[in-house]
Design a protein with these regions (language model features):
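A short, Lys/Arg-rich alpha-helix, primarily the initiator
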Residues: 1-13
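Residue-level detection of the helix-turn-helix DNA-binding "recognition helix"
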Residues: 12, 26, 37, 66
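Alpha-helical residues within the helix-turn-helix
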Residues: 12, 23, 52
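DNA major-groove recognition helix of helix-turn-helix/homeodomain DNA-binding modules
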Residues: 45-60
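Short, charged recognition helix plus adjacent turn
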Residues: 63-70
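Short alpha-helical DNA-recognition segment
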Residues: 16-34
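Residue-level signal for the short linker/turn that defines the boundary of a DNA-recognition helix
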Residues: 5, 15-16, 42-45
């Protein structure tokens, strides 16, 4: 499974910088950057904080995809 996110898109829609979103959810800006690039899997607690900050559901923000094993 690969985790893809819509954090960057939804963050931009709300007019938030990475720094502002990071402050809202209690993490460093780099954590938001890694989440947006798909290089970090958030804890359930962090995922819930992000959903509240971006006013979206978990399945609107986080998309699980099957890996192509070719």
């Amino acid at each position: 499974m690969v985790l893809r996110t819509r954090i960057k898109e939804l963050r931009a829609r709300h007019g938030l910088t990475q720094e502002e979103l990071a402050r809202m959810v209690g993490v460093r800006r780099e954590t938001i950057l890694f989440l947006e690039k798909g290089k970090y899997n958030p804890s359930l607690k962090l995922a819930c904080k992000i959903t509240l900050a971006l006013q979206a559901s978990i399945d609107e923000i986080f998309i699980f995809e099957e890996e192509d094993l070719k």
